[in-house]
A protein has these predicted regions:
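Short connector loops at helix/strand junctions that flank enzyme active sites
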Residues: 2-6, 65, 91
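A glycine-rich, hydrophobic loop/mini-helix early in the fold
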Residues: 1-20
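Short loop segments at secondary-structure junctions
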Residues: 14-16, 74-75, 100-102
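Flexible, glycine/proline-enriched loop segments at strand-loop-helix junctions
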Residues: 16-24, 128-134
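Long, positively charged amphipathic alpha-helical accessory segments at protein N-termini or as interdomain linkers
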Residues: 34-54, 86-187
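Long, well-ordered alpha-helical scaffolding segments within enzyme catalytic domains
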Residues: 23-39
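Aromatic/basic-lined ligand-recognition segments
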Residues: 60-87, 93
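Hydrophobic alpha-helical segments that drive targeting, anchoring, or assembly
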Residues: 1, 22, 93-96
């Protein structure tokens, strides 16, 4: 991922609050993301049809899936999403391209089978849409506002006690041999 061209979002929610059907769940969890695109003036929606993967190591180049991939009017992917489900929770992570930089995405790989041109044919940036404010931080603010409104959340910050507790959990979990060797959570 590109540190400045990409924007990431994550939603963690009670599984019982959302549809059991994965596609329906994606549609509901992506409502605030689509609202942010709309607020920015970007014409973005779910892909109408799938497309084969161009190259698996890069998430933007994996197969285009109408269940969870968002595209611009030209059909290029602007956002991809993935879900992880436990017995009690749904964790959804999304990556969206605000400003596409094919060279930056491909740079970490030695001799990728896809060049910048093929990347640009599959992936588009939100900022490329006519009428969209090219200010990334303004878009991030719109996305944050849409997520807060959708979730009925209150903006806030971590307390010192919460940060200390999180650090303790990280230390206990990730320093444990049973986690490192077998992904057995000791917490």
């Amino acid at each position: 991922h590109d540190a400045t061209g990409d924007v990431a979002d994550s939603i963690v929610a009670a599984k019982s609050a959302f549809p059991g059907d994965v596609t329906d769940c994606y549609r509901e969890l992506l409502e605030p993301v689509l609202a942010a695109f709309e607020a920015a003036g970007a014409d973005v929606g779910f892909a109408d049809a799938g497309a084969p993967a161009l190259w698996e190591p890069l998430c933007y180049l994996r197969a285009l899936d109408p269940a969870h991939d968002l595209v611009g009017p030209d059909g290029r992917k602007v956002a991809g999403n993935a879900q992880y489900r436990t017995r009690e929770a749904v964790v959804q992570h999304g990556s969206l391209t605000f400003e596409s930089d094919p060279e930056a995405h491909l740079a970490p790989f030695v001799d990728p089978p896809i060049g910048p041109g093929a990347f640009a044919e599959r992936v588009g940036g939100v900022s490329e849409s006519p009428g969209v404010d090219p200010d990334r931080s303004a878009f991030v603010d719109r996305l944050e506002s849409a997520l807060v409104e959708w979730a009925g959340a209150e903006a806030g910050a971590w307390t010192d006690a919460e940060r200390e507790r999180a650090a303790e959990l990280c230390d206990r979990k990730y320093a444990a041999d049973r986690w490192v060797e077998g992904r057995d959570d000791p917490t």
